[in-house]
């Protein structure tokens, strides 16, 4: 079974979000199950030179794009036992950021066509082409509409994964006509047309043999208007080929027993070492070293989606409690400035790191007691899974993957691995935070809760089995 992942980002090459984590970890887990997965992505200038140096030039081809033929170098390399192909074209990929350029429609039209034009030259018989998010959605659409009659492609099945429905790749009709050479028959509501523009993600949904969302709850949510980003009707129409498979975490990267980034390695039976990480975290940020004061942390993009309006509304009420708060992330200036002001107002209780620091993030996960993630919506979420693996108890809103992975603590049965609330309401969140703090001070209960969180399986194994089953069903 041969699978080709077409992605716009992938760990360890480049990362802007959770898509890169999935693209980096899932193929390794699938390989353990006997599935041969190879990955194709752009050769961005942002990829570390040492990783590019590990690749060799496999072949040079031309990619037809509108009236032009564009250069396409196919670089080939291996990382952690997985074969990668990097699509080389400096005009499109020698940029200072992955996305957000005036010509993104052209860049990813080129990449989509390049993926398809490369397939006969990869020395790899592709059974299933698995595309991800808007950037590669048109790979599946073009395969069905333009390449399916070619013997090199006619047997290939397609899977399309929605990581975040909010970003759809909406461009002017000229992208469809001039670059992809698709005619008027594709510019209507049953095809690519979307409020006067063309929508790449819509193409992926329409044309793929199977669609997955990154959690079962998100799969249901996106079929409703509130979460559907104007594609809910289309997703209801194609419900029969839509499924939800929750993400995992790469346990070779996120494992408190082996993590080289944290001060003291530990497991569920050596929680005293977790306290050593807490002290180290307090020292790093210059917080008072109080073992009995819970640290509430957030490692997040500072955006509206992450529920920061709720946090902002009741933050001072949380500060009335004996707590410490650590924020690590960057994003919208209004939230950055708010948390910086709170750090100024509560210097003994609040510390903020604007930006991202991988090593520090691991220490925050290991040294915190509670992890706050009150998202407005959350397709899957990795933060809560990492927190759980490190015995840092999540407080989440019941949406998307948060609902699928965090079970609210039940004091009657002792079951659960975190705390959750349903409504997008600041005082519901505050009540849940206060409830979590109350249980934190009940040490026997808390230690049991932490052990329950740490002993569950958050790896990719179950998810990889589900994907393997999906691929197999397409080939039968």
UniProtKB/Swiss-Prot annotation:
InterPro entries: Glyco_trans_1, GS/SS, Starch_synth_cat_dom
Entry-linked SUPFAM superfamilies: UDP-Glycosyltransferase/glycogen phosphorylase
Record protein name field: Glycogen synthase
Pathway, per record: Glycan biosynthesis; glycogen biosynthesis
Catalytic reaction annotation: [(1->4)-alpha-D-glucosyl](n) + ADP-alpha-D-glucose = [(1->4)-alpha-D-glucosyl](n+1) + ADP + H(+)
Record-listed E.C. numbers: 2.4.1.21
Function: Synthesizes alpha-1,4-glucan chains using ADP-glucose.
